[in-house]
Amino acid sequence: MSTDSIVKASNWRLVEVGRVVLIKKGQSAGKLAAIVEIIDQKKVLIDGPKAGVPRQAINLGQVVLTPLTFALPRGARTATVSKKWAAAGVCEKWAASSWAKKIAQRERRAALTDFERFQVMVLRKQKRYTVKKALAKA
């Protein structure tokens, strides 16, 4: 009697060389970098030449793993990381992601002036009114 078992890949993001990370604390907060080398359980070596992140060892508590990865040899130099980053189109993929769009929207809303916030409120009221009107017709 044979039973077929299905091997399924994990859904969580693994700490691996070539994984793109978003730095959430420190001097380079909000910038993207790639994991170049895993130092130990809590630290990795990152490099982000396109985003202006210097090559540095960073604690995993200071970064967020993104779903983006690209092929990168272990311990790659900055020039290699830069070439592979550009070839994989990481910046374009990140800009197209809903995560990046949400961050951009949050920054845009934080930068609104009082009058712009008022305009947003008026537009939301207009939208709500048209929806109510359409529901009343139906």
From Swiss-Prot:
Keywords: Acetylation, Cytoplasm, Ribonucleoprotein, Ribosomal protein. N-terminally acetylated by acetyltransferase NatA. GO terms for molecular function: RNA binding; structural constituent of ribosome. Disulfide bonds: none annotated. It holds the Pfam family Ribosomal_L14e. It is found in: Cytoplasm. SUPFAM superfamilies: Translation proteins SH3-like domain. The modification N-acetylserine is found at residue 2. One of its GO terms (biological process) is cytoplasmic translation. The keyword Hydrolase does not apply. GO terms for cellular component: cytosol; cytosolic large ribosomal subunit; nucleolus. InterPro entries: KOW (IPR005824), Rib_uL2_dom2 (IPR014722), Ribosomal_eL14 (IPR039660), Ribosomal_eL14_dom (IPR002784), Translation_prot_SH3-like_sf (IPR008991). Present with 35100 molecules/cell in log phase SD medium. Component of the large ribosomal subunit (LSU). Mature yeast ribosomes consist of a small (40S) and a large (60S) subunit. The 40S small subunit contains 1 molecule of ribosomal RNA (18S rRNA) and 33 different proteins (encoded by 57 genes). The large 60S subunit contains 3 rRNA molecules (25S, 5.8S and 5S rRNA) and 46 different proteins (encoded by 81 genes). Belongs to the eukaryotic ribosomal protein eL14 family. Component of the ribosome, a large ribonucleoprotein complex responsible for the synthesis of proteins in the cell. The small ribosomal subunit (SSU) binds messenger RNAs (mRNAs) and translates the encoded message by selecting cognate aminoacyl-transfer RNA (tRNA) molecules. The large subunit (LSU) contains the ribosomal catalytic site termed the peptidyl transferase center (PTC), which catalyzes the formation of peptide bonds, thereby polymerizing the amino acids delivered by tRNAs into a polypeptide chain. This is Large ribosomal subunit protein eL14B. It comes from Saccharomyces cerevisiae (strain ATCC 204508 / S288c). The gene is RPL14B.
